[in-house]
Amino acid sequence: MLFIETPIFTKLVTVLMPDDEYRKLQLALVLRPEAGKIILGSGGLRKIRWKSGGSGKRGGLRLIYFWDVPEDTIYMLHGFSIRQC
């Protein structure tokens, strides 16, 4: 599976999580790319909750991605910490 990041995602993910945690997220998506809930009316964008640091999923991160099934590609689009909201 190929991962493609938008420039804004790349910038955000370096601030939001360490490299080893991002690798865990990528592995989780390789194993279950359908894990994120589809955002209604988005054309297939998905939002996944991901724990961050010492906090659980509820206080962690939200990451937006698109899974292109025929191309076997995940586009990492955006992310934010729930604490930023």
Each model region followed by its residue ranges:
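Basic, Lys/Arg-enriched alpha-helical interface segments
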Residues: 1-55, 71
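Residue-level signature of transmembrane alpha-helix interfaces in integral membrane proteins
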Residues: 18-21, 65, 76
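Short, charged/polar low-complexity linear motifs in solvent-exposed/disordered segments
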Residues: 29, 64-65
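Short, surface-exposed coil-to-beta transition loops
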Residues: 58-63
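Enriched for short, Lys/Arg-rich terminal
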Residues: 67-85
